[in-house]
Regions:
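Rossmann-like dinucleotide-binding domain that binds NAD(P)(H)
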Residues: 70-142
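Beta-strand-loop-alpha-helix segment that lines the small-molecule cofactor/substrate pocket
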Residues: 1-35, 50
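Alpha-helical elements of Rossmann-like donor-binding domains used by nucleotide-donor carbohydrate transfer enzymes
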Residues: 16, 42-45, 89-90, 124
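Short beta-strand and adjoining strand-loop segment in the mid-core
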Residues: 43-51, 77
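Pol beta-like nucleotidyltransferase catalytic core
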Residues: 61-73
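Short, well-ordered coil/turn segments that N-cap beta-strands
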Residues: 26-27, 54, 131-135
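Short glycine/serine/threonine-enriched helix-capping/active-site loop
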Residues: 29-32, 58-61, 105
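A short alpha-helix-loop-beta-strand transition element characteristic
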Residues: 49-59, 100-101
Length: 142
């Protein structure tokens, strides 16, 4: 089963889908388009075969310009589920599946319309892994 994100905005619904796939002995994958990007694939290959040395830091910068329609943003799950999820996936994939040791996230909302939804429009995230890897993400809706 190949699913597009978000599978759900509720963790228990995602777990139900995973459990059903396991019970049915079916593969279950959530696809992220950056893993198909030739440049990211080349980077992953170079990291995997040691061609560019040890991964010590990942920095990513994502923008969503122009800002998506408010109708979409109301159902998107928020900036973490809509935008940052792609950066988190890249960190997990490029790091070989390392699990974060600590995470710091800060954000703000400049748009009154987005603020009314209880969401943010600018976020910075730092992640530290036990291997020493440090990652930084800066994301903004515009």
């Amino acid at each position: 089963i190949f699913a597009e994100k978000p599978i759900s905005h509720e963790v228990h619904e995602v777990q139900e889908a995973v459990d059903l796939a396991l019970k049915s002995n079916l593969p279950f994958v959530c696809g992220y388009q950056r893993r198909s990007d030739l440049n990211f694939r080349a980077l992953k290959e170079q990291l995997s075969n040691g061609a560019i040395g040890q991964l010590k830091m990942i920095k990513s910068c994502s923008r969503d310009n122009p800002v998506p329609p408010l109708e979409y943003l109301r159902t998107s799950g928020g900036i973490f589920q809509d935008m940052l999820i792609h950066d988190f996936d890249m960190q997990e994939w490029l790091s070989g599946g390392q699990v974060p040791e600590s995470v710091l996230a800060v954000g703000h909302c400049y748009s009154p319309e987005i603020q009314q939804m209880g969401d943010l429009d600018i976020v910075a995230v730092m992640v530290k892994y036990s291997s020493g890897l440090v990652t930084m993400i800066d994301t903004c809706r515009d």
